[in-house]
């Protein structure tokens, strides 16, 4: 199953985008760009070796993806999840969840969020996962929030948060060999 491909993304352009994608099987690809003021969506994956690259405000032509509510949920191994929100302009309200169900091993999650009020929850229940998280933008009045939960062994987590004030991280890990 493919939405977009490795070199060309599918695109939604307009004020509001609502997107729901379910993919079952191995080696699914989602490469999607959203250019607009508001994004609400859910991506559900079942299978191994899936590749998701979701960009909200990738060109900056139609607002800033100012409001985004994104959920990416998967069960499977060796998935590559890349979520970028507010790439060219700081978003004002972001609520994003990345959830790996029990048995989700050897996954890579990269999330770059640029926003004033950014809530990013990552919950993955599996072993040997790698997280690269960058939350940027102006903090203050409930800005920069990361809630991370990890169950399983061997997690490599890199988190960068920046801005002024409101930099909150809640982190729970379980298992051995966590490199944070």
Where are these regions (language model features)?
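Low-complexity repeat regions of mature extracellularly deployed or surface/particle-associated proteins
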Residues: 1-180
